[in-house]
Curated annotation (Swiss-Prot):
Basic residues bias locations: 1-19, 31-44
Similarity comment text for this entry: Belongs to the bacterial ribosomal protein bL34 family.
Parts forming coiled coils: none
Key words of the record: Ribonucleoprotein, Ribosomal protein
Single Gene Ontology BP annotation: translation
Organism: Coxiella burnetii (strain RSA 493 / Nine Mile phase I)
Region annotated Disordered, chain positions: 1-44
Pfam families: Ribosomal_L34 (PF00468)
Record-given protein name: Large ribosomal subunit protein bL34
GO molecular function, one term: structural constituent of ribosome
Listed GO CC annotations: ribonucleoprotein complex; ribosome
Length: 44
């Protein structure tokens, strides 16, 4: 059986990257929440 996690940097960035977050209103909300919480890394 094939494992579910098949790592790919390109897929990772396109789905969870900074530009992907900035592209939608909800993604920007995610970034703002993480900034407010004081996260060291905002994305990926």
């Amino acid at each position: 059986m094939k494992r579910t996690y098949q790592p790919s940097k390109q897929k990772r960035n396109r789905t969870h990257g900074f530009r992907a977050r900035m592209a939608t209103k909800n993604g920007r909300q995610v970034l703002n929440r993480r900034r407010a919480k004081g996260r060291k890394r905002l994305t990926v």
